Amino acid sequence: MPRFQLSNSTSVPNHNYEWSYEYYDDEEPVSFEGLKAHRYSIVIGFWVGLAVFVIFMFFVLTLLTKTGAPHPEAAEPYEKRMRLTSCADGLGRQRETDGRTGLSRPLLEESRSLFHCYINEEEREGGRAATDAGALTHGRSGIGNSRGQVEEVGLVVQNMVLESRAEREAALLAHFNIPNFVNSELNSALGDEDLLLGDPPIIMEEARPRCTHHIID
């Protein structure tokens, strides 16, 4: 281990400076015997991490139970109420404007509403007929009747439904008073002259011989 010392004295009294340098040359190799990993270090790390994760989730769940998460089911009725109130307000405003202007409700809207009511009634009657047919077939099958009787019941129910639909369509057509024929009296009353939109076209073929006649003269 070499050692080098250097002393230096300045002109200032009672101030002596001394520099010393020391060098250590360790030729021995570094040993890593104490730094070997434990045999079950991976297993220990896994279980420690799992325990930390469980504790963290426990605290998160406790905080959620205290504060409470938002419930989307409670938000949907509120939105529906808002929509219904907005629709009601819109209808009220429309009625007020109609009352101010003095205009009556158009016939087209009334026909649409009647058509929708007719469709709803048809669907309800169809569902009732299907349930009645199912009840009849179930009861008769429990008694032990044959398939022919069940088919007859189905045909009877189907005929009843068709008759009810035909009657309702006839009533609906009578209500709207839609004509299903063409009035030919108006067409017969009109003559050929009335059907013409303008004067007949001028034929230019008659003028051609006259022109040639003038040229010959």
From Swiss-Prot:
Keywords noted in UniProt: Cell membrane, Endoplasmic reticulum, Glycoprotein, Membrane, Transmembrane, Transmembrane helix
Record flagged with keyword Iron: no
An individual GO BP term: protein localization to cell surface
Topology in membrane: Single-pass membrane protein
Main location: membrane
Subcellular location field: Cell membrane; Endoplasmic reticulum membrane
Residues modified by glycosylation: N8
Membrane-crossing segments per the record: 42-62
Keyword Nucleus part of the UniProt annotation: no
Other observations noted: Two paralogs of MRAP2 are present in zebrafish: mrap2a, which plays a role during larval development and mrap2b, which constitutes the ortholog of mammalian MRAP2.
Subunit structure as annotated in this protein's UniProt entry: Interacts with mc4r.
Reported function: Inhibitor of melanocortin receptor 4 (mc4r), a receptor involved in energy homeostasis. Plays a role during larval development in the control of energy homeostasis and body weight regulation by decreasing ligand-sensitivity of mc4r and mc4r-mediated generation of cAMP, leading to stimulate growth during larval development. Acts by stabilizing an inactive conformation of mc4r during embryonic development, when all the energy consumed is obtained from the yolk sac, possibly to speed the rapid maturation to the mobile free-feeding juvenile stage reached at 5 dpf.
Protein name listed in UniProt: Melanocortin-2 receptor accessory protein 2A
Organism classification: Eukaryota, Metazoa, Chordata, Craniata, Vertebrata
